[in-house]
UniProtKB/Swiss-Prot annotation, chain A:
Enzyme class per UniProt: transferase
Record organism: Hahella chejuensis (strain KCTC 2396)
EC id: 2.3.1.46
Positions bound to substrate: R227, D357
GO BP terms, alphabetized: homoserine metabolic process; methionine biosynthetic process
Designated name of the protein: Homoserine O-succinyltransferase
Similarity-based family: Belongs to the AB hydrolase superfamily. MetX family.
Amino acid sequence: MPEVIPPDSVGIVTPQVAQFDIPLTLECGKQLNSFQLMYETYGELNADRSNAVLICHALSGHHHAAGYHSMEDSKPGWWDSCIGPGKPIDTNKFFVVSLNNLGGCAGSTGPASINPETGKAYGPDFPVVTVQDWVRSQAMLADRLNIPHWAAVIGGSLGGMQALQWSIEYPERVHNAAVIASTPRLSAQNIAFNEVARKAITSDPNFYEGRYGEHTTYPDKGLMLARMVGHITYLSNASMGEKFGRDLRAQTLKFGLLDVQFEVESYLHYQGERFSKNFDANTYLLMTRALDYFDPARAHEGDLSKALEPAKCKYLVVSFTTDWRFPPDRSEELVNAMVEAKKSVSYAEVDSPHGHDAFLIPTQRYMDVFHGFMGRVAKEIPHAR
Amino acid sequence: MRADLSIIKDWVQPGTEVLDLGCGDGTLLDYLQTHKQVRGYGLEISSENITECLRKGVNVIEQDLDSKGLSNFKDKSFDMVVMTQALQAVRQPDVLLEEMLRLAKESIITFPNFGYWRLRYYLARKGQMPVSKTLPYTWYNTPNIHLCTFKDFEELCYQKNIHILHRTVVDDEHRTNWLNQLWPNLLGQIAIYHVTR
């Protein structure tokens, strides 16, 4: 709970809902006749609407990226370290929009929402959405907010994929794109981890083919397992070692097979449990699928530089040395393709011990890079506030 | 602007595509893109320099020439590859020189000339590795591991069939004069070469 709102916070924020009664045809061929997107905004849109920045969320993220919902909030939004007055995404300069993606479970239309055509929750019948679908629905939100183009589209991990897709799909509407701790496509190992997570969920006896809602039950054990696997891949060996080492919860070994004995086990259990209480299992399946499917080069015989051809923005690509989910060489692959396609790109490989999660943690070098890039973005804006 | 950079800028044609190895704070690329419509990228490893390039809006890519080389760039992907004051600090300058001419038809290279008379005199008189304005390091903490002279560099170019288009030397005030042009290996402090295959 914040006793006082820190001066570099965006303060108390209120989520908003945008209702769309315009059909959206998805990449899978299915159509959503109506849907809603939950979003938040920070800062003020300037007179010529040129200072808007879009924040795209990662796998389990949502619209609440910065500030607090109330004075009772225990934690600020998920990217509060980077969004606020004086922070890299400076709300004194930029108007920031952050949303919950379609298929999410934080207020945007998703598997847990009521399907207006049946009057029941979509559940597993919610269509598979892709990064491209998200970007298209985000463009509809931009139209609604009367934002003709983004000064920058920014995202980490799965959010970085959306930033990349924006630059390809709507080149005229993106001036800058920051792709952080991301990849142009998942590796087989990445997909394998996602499949383990999905299998954990679908093999929970309470999963009922995704119709757990109708059985008034919930596959929380499976979701917990999925998150535990995911969480291991978000940290590095070093950061886990530093946080927990081989510390025991009790003084002595219990020689029991089922007890939680090591601190790291206890931590994973805690993270898994907390997550399984707050996240929809069908959404988790959906989001990991969107990750698996993303591959803008596929339509160009695997040639990423060809896929990037339409883009007009200036890119920032950032990777972190200990990120083994999307390691630096995945970012370099992207940078090389951008150079080949003669795009404006800058790349920094930030030395951080925090693994994939480093993109959420404000280390000095990372913030310097981000500040440098966003400072230049601000300078480009005519009549910046 | 550093004088070797201000000489180089006159050797770069407008509208060309440039790769600047060890681009520092991006001064040269910033000038070239503002005044000569040059498009380019700088490679750099210093984090302060990378941040400064980002501020300037110069495309900078973090890449260590020693560990990664230039193999991630395709043949002839640039018009010009520039490397100022970095040749002497890399592990394999000869390999790098070939790589530079694989990426572009032309290259510009500047380095401190170890044949400069004051350095020779310093070593002869004191019997110690020279420390000067252009080489301000002691032997144990210098980044310069392959110091060479004007003559050494030309010998390398000769062996590798690299053609020298222009060469010049400047003094520590970064001036050229008739004396250092006459005896460059003895009187030039910084060597500036424009080479091609």
